[in-house]
Amino acid sequence: MAIVTSFRFTKNCGAICVDQESWHVWRRKNWFTDHLYSLIDPDQATRFGVELVYGGVGHPPYHLEVAEKARKLLREHLSRKDLDPAAVTAEKLGHVVLKAFQQVHRRRVDDKMEYLFGFNSDELNAGTFTNCQGTFPIQREEVKSRALKIVHGEEDTGYGPLTPPVEACLIGIDRHYGFSAFCLKEKDGVLGFQSCWFESLGQGRQGPAIRFAKLLNQRFLDSRRQGIGRDRGVFYLLDAISEAMDHYGQDGGFVRMMIIDGDAESATDRLRDIRDNAARLCVEIVKAQRNELLDRETAVDLMTDLTRPEPDIDAVESRFFKAVDDPMRLGKLLRRYKIEEPGLPEQGPEPRLFQADAVQTGAVREGDAS
């Protein structure tokens, strides 16, 4: 996958968004948004008031394995009878995820060394390896040198030559500290705390960083601490992702976003998964606003409706096109036409869908109705 970005909206609310596009042999493209995982079982999340969401960049199977292993470890951890609820925080649970992350890395390293040399990292440290014929010392310097390169990450463990580094962003909420976010990187093997509003990893991470930096530099310290709010935060998060989609390679596929809200009363409201058509329409709304076809407040209102449980996507899309002065121009933009000059497209669905409605409401400019 290409990029993952997290953003804190308020003290108790935030989101994580992925935009994933992969390509093979420089030509074939695949779009997928699978590498965003909710890690806590719903019943345990309700009991302890926590949520944890994991999103990664780099080698896709790595993150799938981490998520499955982390879910198992977290389920066992939260099922302990002697567990103090006061000790259940996003940071504590993050270290459980880190353990799963490290175990997957260690397995991949050991698998490659077992395949190449017949010994694992423990045997490399001991200087001896054991097989069915007995125990033998590891003596060849070229073998030890290459094995150490694999352990240190200087040689890949089965990734493609164009795969970005394996990195992940982890966001969570708990009853004690509210929203927290962390970073995990395969080359470091530590859990890094997100000390500012945002984190961006992967291809094109500079784009969201620039957009968020401009936003934060305009705000006073108290305003930063208070947060920007959930509804506006969703807009700015997707605006930052759009910056990467517009200007950086390997970005531009479908997006998927998970919103976690510590102030929500129900499990449905506490974790919101925005995907497929709703996510696509959100990106189109942001694109219209970035091209000055839609004002920001209207864009925020439309996206707020799209991020509610079971949104009426068709109704929101209809409101979206009616909110712009020139729906035909908007249609050209969304179909990737050049829109330097205004005017109606000769072909396309916009005249049929929106011009008739405009005639009925008297909104068509003179000459356009004909």
What feature does the model see in each segment?
Residues 1-154, 189-235, 276-370:
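Conserved short S/T/G-enriched processing/targeting/catalytic segments and their helical context
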Residues 2-8, 13-17, 162-174, 178-182, ...:
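Short beta-strand scaffold segments in enzyme catalytic cores
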Residues 45, 159-161, 248:
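Sterically constrained small-residue positions within well-ordered secondary structures
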Residues 151-202:
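A mid-sequence, solvent-exposed acidic-amphipathic segment
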Residues 227-234, 243-260:
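Flexible, glycine/charged-enriched surface loops at secondary-structure junctions
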Residues 233, 269-270:
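Extended charged low-complexity segments that act as oligomerization/scaffolding linkers
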Residues 242, 263-266:
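Short Gly/Pro-enriched loop/turn and capping motifs at secondary-structure junctions
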